[in-house]
Amino acid sequence: MFLPTKDGPFLTTTTSNFPKDRNRAFMKRTLLYIIGVMLLFSACSTQIDEEHRLTYVKPAAVGKNVLLVDFTGQRCINCPTASHEIEKIQEQYSADTVIAVGMHSGPLGFRGNAKTVGLSTTTGDNYYRQWNVEYQPQGVIDYLGKSDYTAWGGIVHQQLKQTAPLNIKIDAKTNGTSGSGSISLEGLDGSIQGKLQLWVVEDSITALQMMPDGTTNRNYLHMHVFRTAVNGEAGESVNVKEGETTTINFSTDFAATWVPRHLWLIAFVYNDRGVLQVKRAAFKAN
């Protein structure tokens, strides 16, 4: 550039600052990028209280079903009246909600002979003695004690007001001569220690029955007849925790006289508080 002097214009040069300014801008952008990355990692590594990391959702409550064990016998003239009471209760609540078992046993039970089908069993007699049954018909609802059939409706109504601390799912299959499958126990409320009991019952058995009028009906249709205890008379110990599922496998042989399409598996969990939940499922053909 030219600067005026008294001797005339004087040519001078000035060094440009452009490269330095560009370097400063680049360093500034780089520094901002590094700071941003540091802030991002800082935010990601922020400590979160354990209680705020995952929100636990309690399993939904399910309704409780009721187990009604009817200590009955083919030579019991009042037992058909008790069976009719069960029919009325199941019509009101359904047979899947009020699950009945006809426990043929005791002095009025009948083991059968060469000509006549008997439905009493050794296991049934053992349960009869275990519960100290005094007369027939007499029932045990949810393993809470004995009761007369005239009281069953009221007891069932009260038991159905409860919720179950666990859910039971049954997978039962049959090849015609035996049954097998699995039981899934899902904990819903607290930790549960108890016994899992598995029974096989049979519907629609035509056999002798003494009637209230003193006659003998040889074509009486017996329902939910106890056949066998799959896993022992007392069942097996289980421990089910809330939010977890426990699975138990089972297998059992069928007697030649049983009709597979009429068979049901009943599964229930009980402890000193009685039956906590009960379910039933038909055996499905493989």
Predicted segment positions?
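Bacterial Sec-dependent N-terminal signal peptides
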Residues: T5-D7, N23, M27-L32, G36-L67, ...
